[in-house]
Amino acid sequence: MRVNIVGAGLAGVEVAYKLLREGFKVRIFEQKPVKFSPVHKMETFGELVCSNSLKSESLKNAEGILKEEMKLLDSLVLNCAYKTRVPAGKALAVDREKFSQCITKVLESFENIEIVRKEVEKIDLDTNEIWVVATGPTTDGKFAQWLSKLTGGFLNFFDAVAPIISRDSIDFNKCFVGDRYGVGTGDYINCPMTKEEYERFYRELVNAEMIEMKDFDRKLLFERCQPIEEIAKSGEKSLLFGPLRPVGLVNPHTGEIPYAVIQLRKEDEEGNMYNIVGFQTRLKWSEQKRIIRLIPGLENAEILRYGVMHRNTYIDTPRVLDEFLRHKKYKNIFFAGQITGVEGYLESAACGIYVGLNISRILSGKEPVKLPPKTMMGALINYITKADELKPMYANFGLINVKMKKNEKREKLHEICINEMKNFLNMLK
């Protein structure tokens, strides 16, 4: 039997990869390049539309634990991430074009794959074939209308993207290279600000013109991608404890810690492009250029991609889907990725791995399985399928119910999670 996957984002490609390696036939429907969402630019699969960072690799962080679990499950997304990584201190960041090309090339190499470049408008509910909806948070058009009827409506939140600038336009006489606390290999460019420079930047930022968005509601902003202007409006010093915090950074030109620092992170392997860390925004493009050029060292910044805001859509998973992310009524329709309420690149990919695993089992005549609740992946799936009031959720320690003090949890939880996942995989053999 052939499996149909709608969407070749991070979740869709993981579902496909698992099934293709098991020898099953897969047909992927990808609307690009026939149609692009407001935030997608490339024709290739697994496009990263926000940051190019896949977060920390430290096992003292939930994101690091999630990566280790995904490695055990042979994640395509992680395999390509490690092949296309760029320096980013303790974080795993990638050259987004090479990363997307890597994923596409791997999937295209399978003989049992069919790639259909078209926009899907609906799924035939009378079909016996398995379908996976992995259309992501920017699902729209006729398919969104059909999906809304199938699921009883959508939930929403707003997300934003940071600008990217050219390295050649940075004045290194005013900036310095370095990582916080001297840890790392000098992966960030730092633009230091005096108190006067910060206050001017702050005044102009909070008074800058923004793009109006239909049905925009500040209460629906996702906490990890708050626009910088929204953070600023919460208080004059709010940025100093957020994306502009200077802690751990000493300006070699003065020997002192600056009043504020704006950091730039590599966007590509060659280091020709840098994104402005924490500068997600919905300012008008003309205002973005004006505000960015107030930053010391960026007075002549060439902006290669402007920041944008977009509405993210997801379904009410606990009400609509079962514990295996199948539709409760139409058991041949699965959902994967951010459309289910997970938030984050790797969280979406992990969701796809889980769905791919269970579809493979079903096609092999076996029963689907739940992931252990004391794994990061299992806890995440457990949350989105059982939450009383579903809110977008990323990997975090609070998802796993173990009786430990906070510091002890940070030190030891990775051992519990990884052992649980290893035992689970051994059980499946």
UniProtKB/Swiss-Prot annotation:
Enzymatic class: transferase
Catalytic activity annotation: uridine(54) in tRNA + (6R)-5,10-methylene-5,6,7,8-tetrahydrofolate + NADH + H(+) = 5-methyluridine(54) in tRNA + (6S)-5,6,7,8-tetrahydrofolate + NAD(+); uridine(54) in tRNA + (6R)-5,10-methylene-5,6,7,8-tetrahydrofolate + NADPH + H(+) = 5-methyluridine(54) in tRNA + (6S)-5,6,7,8-tetrahydrofolate + NADP(+)
Keywords: Cytoplasm, FAD, Flavoprotein, Methyltransferase, NAD, NADP, Transferase, tRNA processing
Domain of life: Bacteria
Binding site for FAD: 7-12
GO biological process: tRNA methylation; tRNA wobble uridine modification
Subcellular location per the Swiss-Prot or TrEMBL entry: Cytoplasm
Keyword Cytoplasm: yes
Entry EC no(s): 2.1.1.74
Main location: cytoplasm
GO molecular function, one term: tRNA (uracil(54)-C5)-methyltransferase activity, 5,10-methylenetetrahydrofolate-dependent
Cofactors demanded by this protein: FAD
This protein's GO CC annotations: cytosol
Record-stated family: Belongs to the MnmG family. TrmFO subfamily.
Function: Catalyzes the folate-dependent formation of 5-methyl-uridine at position 54 (M-5-U54) in all tRNAs.
Name the record gives this protein: Methylenetetrahydrofolate--tRNA-(uracil-5-)-methyltransferase TrmFO
Lineage: Bacteria, Thermotogati, Thermotogota, Thermotogae, Thermotogales
Name of the gene encoding the protein in the UniProt record: trmFO
